[in-house]
């Protein structure tokens, strides 16, 4: 049974995240943690916009916060977000990974170690290589992996890089990702 969804996005990610979050039903009782490479001054505006489009609570993650259902956590600007063994969030200012902090790989890897087969990892649009290695780690630990179709993504580099590293479980258009999450969570 799926207990957590983790998502990574960069260039074009605001639109992509808005599309799939808006389609998640209130009945879906899971948490979502997102790393989005975004400018520091935009996160507050984004969170309030997304809160009006989804039935989930959308918020900036806090240190030692328990991961709770029906909540979407965003990594704060300039902090890596990590999943701890006790299923809480920790924040770190460790060195950048793939030129990024927050790093998608850091989130994906720590979530894979804790949630294993109870995890869905989703890599969306983006113009760097962050997220591919972490998504592979999710697959190695038995989690499900979804990559936005590089052919239709706003920026294809991140999803394409993942498909060259390994074979994700699903490569699908952004409009169909929420439906796939629902399907996997009800199996």
Language-model regions: role of each:
Residues 1-187:
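Conserved acid/base catalytic micro-environments in cytosolic active-site loops
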């Amino acid at each position: 049974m799926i207990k957590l969804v983790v998502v990574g996005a960069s260039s074009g990610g605001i639109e992509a995240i808005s599309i799939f979050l808006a389609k998640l039903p209130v009945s879906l009782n899971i948490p979502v943690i997102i790393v989005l490479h975004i400018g520091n001054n935009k996160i507050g505006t984004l969170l309030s916009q997304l809160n009006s489009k989804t039935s989930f609570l959308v918020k900036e993650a806090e240190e030692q916060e328990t991961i709770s259902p029906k909540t979407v956590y965003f990594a704060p600007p300039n902090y890596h977000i990590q999943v701890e063994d006790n299923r809480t969030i920790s924040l770190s200012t460790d060195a950048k990974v793939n030129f990024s902090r927050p790093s998608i790989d850091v989130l994906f890897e720590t979530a894979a170690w804790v949630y294993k087969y109870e995890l869905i990892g989703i890599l969306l649009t983006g113009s760097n290589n962050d997220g591919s290695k972490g998504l592979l780690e999710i697959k190695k630990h038995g989690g499900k992996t979804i990559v936005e179709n590089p052919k239709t993504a706003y920026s294809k580099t991140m999803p394409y890089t993942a498909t060259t590293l390994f074979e994700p479980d699903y490569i699908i258009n952004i409009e169909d990702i929420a439906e796939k999450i629902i399907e996997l969570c009800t199996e």
